[in-house]
Each structure stands twice: as structure tokens, then as C-alpha cells.
Amino acid sequence: MTSSVINVLNKIKDLDIFEDDLYFVGGTALSYFIKHRVSEDIDIVSPKILKYKNIIPIMQDLGAKKIEDENTFSLRLAGMFPDEYILKFILDDVKIEFFCANRPIQKELLKQIEFTTYDNSKLKILDLKQIAKLKVIAFFQRDKIRDLFDFGEILENKIVSFQDILQISKELKNISSEKQLIKFILDKKEEKDDENVYLDEQSRIDLSFLEIKKAVLKKIEKIGNQKCKT
């Protein structure tokens, strides 16, 4: 985490809104456990519709600025009220996103929630394995460089079994084999104006999409070789 993220977490961690079903997840929550990269934003998930009438005024009283999400228009077209599904704020230059887990695979994962608390506060942080599975789901749904890097670290640290990853990929993308997974990764394209991945806040060196992709493919190849030996 950046020092800015830590400062913002300290500002929000004891807010009354976190007495509801809200859980700290995403790349920053993952880095809290495995220290794999520098993370710059805060993601909060709820298995239920967001209580926006509580969240918005409390965040604004803290000095946070509410910003519009790029999916707002499509949510309205689908007959949904956007603030019930996603809320984004900027506080001290740190993005904070609250979102409702409205996809069936997310809902199923969050039926059995395990969590601890962040720094003994009101802010609940999901169990590492559940954070990682939500990250794997995100990896299959978008082409963000940080999702690709996090996916590689989940493989490297064996947080989610390769079999469980293939179960998720089969449900989302009909990918059920190592070969199909490799093709899926090879076909991934770098998003324009995507966020960067770096490992040290003090001496920052951004990793490229291509080098991260190559590293992830090597990790999958290593897993395949280990399976062949057993």
C-alpha cells in the first residue's frame, strides 16, 4: 500500500457504515496479506444492495468527493439505480470504491463469508482466499494490468488451487484446461490508459503488460510441469 492509502484507511476504518455488510477486498486487501505490489486504491464489497443513503453523507462529511462511475449509464439503461450497485469517491487523492456483488458467481462466493478486522477496527477484511477468488473472477472479466499481475501472484503463492481457478474460468469463459487458459492469456490486450504496476513506492519502476503476461505464462507452465511429475 502507498502511504496515502494507509492514511485514508486510518481515516475510514472506524466509520459506522462498516458495521453493515461491507468488506475490504481487491488488490490493496490482497497486498495487505502478501505484500506483492504497491496498491493505490481501496475496494469495498457488499453482498447486498448498497445503503447509499448512509454511505454518501458519511463519506462526504469526511471530505470525500463523489465521482461518477463509467458504468452508470449502462446501469440506468438496465433499469437499475446506480448508487445501489456502485459508489466511487476520492479522498486525499485515493480512490475508494464501494460495490455490490451482483454477479451470480460473486454472490455464491459471498454466501459463506470469513473475515478478520483491519487494524482491530470496524473495517472488515475478507479472508485471503475469498479476496483471491474475487480477484480471479475480475481477471476473467476485464483486461487490467493489475488483475493480470495479481493473478500471477495468486498462482505463485498457491492461494487458490489451479483446479479452483479452472472451475471459475469454466463458469465465466468456458475455459476448462491449461491449454485454453494459456490461449486466453495470450489473447489479452493492454487497456489504453490503464493503471501501472510497481513494486516499490520509493524507487518506482513500472512493469510492462508484456513482461507481466510472460511471467504469468511461465508460472502456468511451471504448474503444468509439476503436475506431469506427480
State each model region's role.
Residues 1-230:
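Compositionally biased terminal segments of proteins
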